[in-house]
Amino acid sequence: MDRIKCTVAYDGMHFCGYQIQPNHRTVQQEIEKALQKLHKGELVRVQASGRTDSTVHAKGQVIHFDTPLSLEEWQWSNALNTMLPDDIVIRQVEKKTEEFHARYGVEKKEYRYRVLLSKTADVFRRNYVYQYPYPLEINSIRKAIPYFIGTHDFTSFCSAKTDKKDKVRTIYEIELIEQDDEIIFRFVGNGFLYNMVRIIVGTLLSVGQGKLDPDSIPEILAKQNRQFAGKMAPGHGLYLWEVNYNN
């Protein structure tokens, strides 16, 4: 058996998230459907670095699966991309040992969130950026960002629906990039709770709008209560950008 690692990109707009759900189109479902065809009807389960929500995009999602088929890496890439729909692309294929695990071997993840600063919607970017029509004080956002960096209990910044009991995570970097009429938030951490990036982005936008003080972030973290943080930003501005592994 070979263990195959794939780096996957997808446009999340027409998916109900990554993970298989009955009666809904998902990324995992489409990948496993393609693998089933390649394996002559045999079901092949894939493991992913993590789940993404409905409408969330990925540039660097990582999956693995085990297979009895002996194909070269380029053959896997070509075969899967031929069978997958246009909104999923296998960017890279690597053969790994059985010690590799797409989920349990993750060292850090990078997410990016795009915000379009415009009162007018952009018809070509509407599915890929969060259009924000209100003026923002960027310096206030920059002042708030360092409070999130480090190891914290992020209960205040995750969905109540999360199934994780341990809410402690480490954020290594948060960068605010100003690019033409967009601002891009770049997050690097050892892991992220359900909706965590989107809630932090929503909170930072509230800071930029003057609804929250930058220096209130430590208090919000300490309260460990979701109701004190800002609104959650929508899914379509979020990208799973890159996943790094221990080995």
UniProtKB/Swiss-Prot annotation:
It catalyses: uridine(38/39/40) in tRNA = pseudouridine(38/39/40) in tRNA. The active site is at D53. GO terms for biological process: tRNA pseudouridine synthesis. Substrate binds at Y111. Its EC number is 5.4.99.12. It comes from the Bacteria. Keywords: Isomerase, tRNA processing. Transmembrane segments: none annotated. InterPro entries: PsdUridine_synth_cat_dom_sf, PsdUridine_synth_TruA, PsdUridine_synth_TruA_a/b_dom, PsdUridine_synth_TruA_C, TruA/RsuA/RluB/E/F_N. GO terms for molecular function: pseudouridine synthase activity; RNA binding; tRNA pseudouridine(38-40) synthase activity. The keyword Protein transport does not apply. NCBIfam families: hisT_truA (TIGR00071). Homodimer. Belongs to the tRNA pseudouridine synthase TruA family. Formation of pseudouridine at positions 38, 39 and 40 in the anticodon stem and loop of transfer RNAs. This is tRNA pseudouridine synthase A 1. It comes from Bacillus cereus (strain ATCC 14579 / DSM 31 / CCUG 7414 / JCM 2152 / NBRC 15305 / NCIMB 9373 / NCTC 2599 / NRRL B-3711). The lineage of its organism: Bacteria, Bacillati, Bacillota, Bacilli, Bacillales. The gene is truA1.
